């Protein structure tokens, strides 16, 4: 599987989703720009080798994560939005309810495998709640790849952020200003369709702090 990187915007929104619902399990989707066809002669791992860059994060649900009808509605709407913006659903993230549980459960593996049917380099990202602090001192994620029909954890020491010092600084600033209170997930959108799950205000805040 190619390398995986998250933009500051994608990482921060994932962190804010967990911060808004600290006592619940939360999940969401990660989107990447549509890839151009690769040239076959490029060497693996060489300078021309590609990686998946998650440019944005779409928060899905909090609390109960396994309701299939709601997930289908979300996937359909988000897939349509991705096509309009030349994106593709390329990953799934989840934070479990229990603080010390950072392993993917059946729901996480099932949704990620569903995404992998349409995007071969899908990543499953688990948020490690034990590393979650208001100062965001270290990255809080574990990245899993689909290998031989199983989800396996990638190197935990690898830097999966496109610019970690920036992501650390901005996520800490957003937490300090309680920006998570304005974050909208798909559950919030289903409660009131005026709630925008693309979170334009948070996107602007991240851009302003960059």
UniProtKB/Swiss-Prot annotation:
Membrane topology field: Peripheral membrane protein
GO biological process, one term: protein insertion into ER membrane by stop-transfer membrane-anchor sequence
Domain MPN: 4-150
Subcellular location: Endoplasmic reticulum membrane
Entry-linked CDD domains: MPN_UPF0172
Taxonomic superkingdom: Eukaryota
Record carries keyword Cell cycle: no
Keywords: Endoplasmic reticulum, Membrane
The UniProt record lists the keyword ATP-binding: no
Transmembrane segments: none
GO cellular component: cytoplasm; EMC complex
Pfam assignment, any one: UPF0172
Subunit structure, as described in the record: Component of the ER membrane protein complex (EMC). EMC8 and EMC9 are mutually exclusive subunits of the EMC complex.
Annotated function: Part of the endoplasmic reticulum membrane protein complex (EMC) that enables the energy-independent insertion into endoplasmic reticulum membranes of newly synthesized membrane proteins. Preferentially accommodates proteins with transmembrane domains that are weakly hydrophobic or contain destabilizing features such as charged and aromatic residues. Involved in the cotranslational insertion of multi-pass membrane proteins in which stop-transfer membrane-anchor sequences become ER membrane spanning helices.
Family per record: Belongs to the EMC8/EMC9 family.
Name used for this protein in its record: ER membrane protein complex subunit 8
Species of the source: Bos taurus (Bovine)
Gene name tied to this protein: EMC8
């Amino acid at each position: 599987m190619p390398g995986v990187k998250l933009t500051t915007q994608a990482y921060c929104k994932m962190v804010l989703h967990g911060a808004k619902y600290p006592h619940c399990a939360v999940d969401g989707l990660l989107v990447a720009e549509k890839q151009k066809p690769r040239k076959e002669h490029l060497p693996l791992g060489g300078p021309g080798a590609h990686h998946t860059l998650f440019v944005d994060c779409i928060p899905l649900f909090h609390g109960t994560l396994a309701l299939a009808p709601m997930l289908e509605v979300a996937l359909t709407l988000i897939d349509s939005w991705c096509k309009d913006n030349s994106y593709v659903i390329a990953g799934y993230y989840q934070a479990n309810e229990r603080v010390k549980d950072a392993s993917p459960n059946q729901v996480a593996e099932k949704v990620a495998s569903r995404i992998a049917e349409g995007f071969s380099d899908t990543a499953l990202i688990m948020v490690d709640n034990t590393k979650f602090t208001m100062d965001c001192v270290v990255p809080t994620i574990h990245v899993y790849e689909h290998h031989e029909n199983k989800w396996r954890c990638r190197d935990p020491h690898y830097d999966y952020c496109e610019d970690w010092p920036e992501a650390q600084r901005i996520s800490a600033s957003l937490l300090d200003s309680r920006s998570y209170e304005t974050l909208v997930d798909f559950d919030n959108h289903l409660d009131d369709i005026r709630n925008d799950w693309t979170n334009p205000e948070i996107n602007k805040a991240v851009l302003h702090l960059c």
